[in-house]
Amino acid sequence: MTDLTGYQAINEKYQLNGATILVDRQHILSHWQSGMADFNKRQPFTIHTTSGLGSLSKQLTADSILLLNTAGKLRLDAPLATYLPAYRYADQITLRQMLHMASGIPDYTELLLAEYATKMPDASESRLSYPILEGLHDEDGFQQVIALLNQHPLDFSPDEKGVYSNSNYLILGHIITQITKMSLGDFLNQHFFKPLAMTQTHLGTQYAAANSYDDLDFTNGRTKVIGRGAYQGGDGAVVSSLVDLAKWAQAVLHQKILSTTAWREALTITHDFYGMGWMQSQTPGWLSHGGHIFGYWAYFDLSFDKQLAQITLNNMSPGAEARKAWQAEMAAWRAAL
């Protein structure tokens, strides 16, 4: 029997501003929620609140590429130069390597964070990301990123190892739009959100019902608003609710939408680091992915052996130490199931 008491107790202990659910193949087994989606409007954060997923969005970008591969619209082992000749190292890299974070392409967010940190030395990473990503919401912004990446060598030889880089999935999202002649949001809606009845899920952080906040200022008890933004890149722009993410978790557990071969590819971890939108969880035997954009945080852990998924959304960081402690206790709880 799943220890739902222990699950609730850990969440009560840390009082995260957000909500979390435990899901099996058919039902939401348990949920917990606390705090505000919007402090100014006094709107509580619930399992129906839409919030930014950040890099958890990469699962959908990866699966979109896999759908197009199955349909013969692209090839995973084709060189990136086939789809993005403007990138100077594109002839050395394949889409498969990008999906596995094994391309060596530097992380554009790290490059831009370093630049903005000198302009805003007292700002948190959450706050710094706002002006960076706000400037990248259209084709001109994407081309600026490619121009920036063209100024830097690869971090390592392709397929040498796996190292996390948002650039891979920003570019993959762009390739989807180029091949399909659809916006990424329309493609996701047609192939994922509508078939799974994920009616509260959209591409574009501007659609989040929850506002995003920096760490709570405990000196005066006031919140520091970061905002929703309007980011739409393939590396981290989906917004969703826990009710909809339960449907996504169940689709993964049932292996819907993709072919059996495509699911096998997506879930295979390479270089002991990354699958295609999946990583090894802190809990042995589980898979996971997290996400962070502006003040939004997301955590997704799933076990095929247990046929369970745990998903959490926050719109304000409890602070790095509290977040790590909560993650560690939750990982230990999952391991004991």
Language-model features, listed with the residues they occupy:
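Short, surface-exposed loop or secondary-structure junction motifs
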Residues: H31, D91-F294, A298
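Short, well-ordered beta-strand elements
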Residues: S30-W32, S64, Y299-S317
